[in-house]
Design a protein with these regions (language model features):
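Catalytic alpha/large subunits of respiratory electron-transfer oxidoreductases
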Residues: 2-6, 10, 16-345
């Protein structure tokens, strides 16, 4: 079975003939501690239950939430827990003479404080990783504010964001709202890989409502038919000007949805794509209280919350000022909070 949701057949099996191989013979259900929580493998926010035995996570199961994941979870969500037990860093290390050596938390804190004190606030920067929880992010920001530095960023890439309004960086139509849409336009997005639960909703909308689906860019097999209308930013310009056939289709639709993927938001081109689409939707009254067709599909669980907390450095008309300073070597000390994807070359 080729599907990102294939393991859900385990939950569907009425007699227990289909079982989870990694969980087989691991524990008895009544011995497990059950904790209800939220999935962090993508930005969908699927409701899950984590079953633990002692310190080990034995299995992850879906919880019903009709507004988000219904009763499904992705295979990635279900099986990612096998990496939680082994090869974990459970003690701090300090590099001495090119070698990492174990140390105590007290010594690590002293080393950190001494390093930070040796630089001015403008030379100190912090980057938050994609799996950092909001309480940790808030504490991280408070710490930087206490030393007089505002050089904070939650983006490990040059993704364009407009934090002036919250609607600029969230999925406004809601996941459940996909089922009510009569037209969906994907812009630089592959929902099957980026958010498989959301992709299942799009498939459901197509099957039940015959929703028309279009894409700018070729995302490959999405498990439902769609029409590719172009592959570059010139299509966005034509749509905004009303000179592309999809423009009229969007205008005639009752509840259109435009999903902008992160790959369409890189750099200054991302600024143009987002702002042009938003202006087009606003002009045609598709950004309303009862229906908002503007949707940004992020891939990181903590990205929206970090933006809400102000973890970004944006100067006037410069969305990427933090990265410009980083590339120009203006930061002498960089504090990475779970940020592993920064390329310092």
């Amino acid at each position: 079975m080729e599907s990102e949701l294939s393991a859900n057949v385990i939950d569907l099996c009425p007699v227990g003939a289909l079982t989870s191989k990694p969980y087989a013979f691991e524990a008895r259900p009544w011995d497990l501690k059950k904790t209800e929580t939220i999935d962090v493998m993508d930005a969908v926010g699927s409701n899950i239950r984590v079953d633990t035995y002692g310190w080990e996570v034995k299995r992850i199961l879906p919880r019903i939430n009709e507004d988000i994941n219904e009763e499904w979870i992705s295979d990635k969500t279900r099986y990612a827990c096998d990496g939680l037990l082994k090869q974990r860093i459970d003690t701090p290390y300090i590099r001495e003479n090119g070698q990492l050596k174990k140390t105590t938390w007290e010594n690590a804190k002293k080393e950190l404080i001494n390093k930070i004190k040796s630089f001015s606030p403008n030379e100190v920067a912090g980057i938050v990783g994609d799996l950092s929880d909001l309480e940790m992010i808030y504490s991280f920001k408070s710490f930087f504010n206490s030393i007089g530095s505002n050089n904070l960023e939650c983006r490990q890439d040059r993704i364009y964001i407009n934090p002036e309004e919250r609607i600029n960086y969230i999925f406004n139509s809601s996941i459940k709202g996909i089922e009510n849409s009569d037209l969906i336009l994907l812009v630089g997005s592959n929902p099957r890989l980026e958010a498989s639960i959301l992709n299942a909703r799009i498939r459901k909308a197509y099957q039940n409502n015959n929703t028309k689906i279009y894409s700018i860019g070729d995302p490959g097999d999405l498990t439902y038919p769609y029409e590719i209308i172009g592959s570059n930013t010139s299509i966005i310009k034509l749509i905004a000007a009303g000179s592309h056939e999809i423009s009229e289709k969007i205008k005639k639709s009752k509840k259109p949805i435009i999903i902008i993927g992160e790959s369409a938001l890189y750099g200054e081109a991302g600024r143009y794509i987002f702002e042009t689409i938003k202006k087009f939707l606003f002009t045609n009254n598709f950004i309303r209280n009862d229906w908002n067709a503007l949707n940004v599909l992020t891939q990181q669980a903590s990205r929206v919350g970090a933006i809400d907390l102000g973890l970004y450095s944006i100067a006037k008309n410069k969305n990427f000022s933090f990265f410009d300073k980083l590339e120009n070597g203006l930061f002498k000390f960089i504090y990475l909070l779970g940020a592993d994807d920064i390329n310092f070359k």
